[in-house]
Amino acid sequence: MMLEHVLVLSAYLFSIGIYGLITSRNMVRALMCLELILNAVNMNLVTFSDLFDSRQLKGDIFSIFVIAIAAAEAAIGPAIVSSIYRNRKSTRINQSNLLNK
């Protein structure tokens, strides 16, 4: 695949993720948009690692690290959302201010 195609796809995924993160009012949707952003970053890391330094796997290793962080976020995020839902009876971001009683 050509470099331009991967970069356009990655920019498209990143833009969708940023737009969804800014406009979403639901916590689950915000977590999904955050995953889109992380996947776009991983695509760029692997692409540029292959393009500039194909013998050393620094970009690939760093993308595996980002995938591990995303897996931890995917495990902890829904647990936090369900805990907030149990206490506040809502998953809307603007209604879940935990600093107020």
Curated annotation (Swiss-Prot):
GO terms for molecular function: oxidoreductase activity, acting on NAD(P)H, quinone or similar compound as acceptor; quinone binding. It is an enzyme of class 7 (translocase). Its EC number is 7.1.1.-. The chain crosses the membrane at residues 2-22, 32-52, 61-81. GO terms for biological process: ATP synthesis coupled electron transport; photosynthesis, light reaction. It is found in: Plastid, Chloroplast thylakoid membrane. Its main location: plastid. GO terms for cellular component: chloroplast thylakoid membrane; NADH dehydrogenase complex. It is a multi-pass membrane protein. The keyword Transmembrane helix applies. Keywords: Chloroplast, Membrane, NAD, NADP, Plastid, Plastoquinone, Quinone, Thylakoid, Translocase, Transmembrane, Transmembrane helix, Transport. InterPro entries: NADH_UbQ_OxRdtase_chain4L/K, NUOK/Mnh_C1-like. It catalyses: a plastoquinone + NADH + (n+1) H(+)(in) = a plastoquinol + NAD(+) + n H(+)(out); a plastoquinone + NADPH + (n+1) H(+)(in) = a plastoquinol + NADP(+) + n H(+)(out). It holds the Pfam family Oxidored_q2. NDH is composed of at least 16 different subunits, 5 of which are encoded in the nucleus. NDH shuttles electrons from NAD(P)H:plastoquinone, via FMN and iron-sulfur (Fe-S) centers, to quinones in the photosynthetic chain and possibly in a chloroplast respiratory chain. The immediate electron acceptor for the enzyme in this species is believed to be plastoquinone. Couples the redox reaction to proton translocation, and thus conserves the redox energy in a proton gradient. Belongs to the complex I subunit 4L family. This is NAD(P)H-quinone oxidoreductase subunit 4L, chloroplastic. The gene is ndhE.
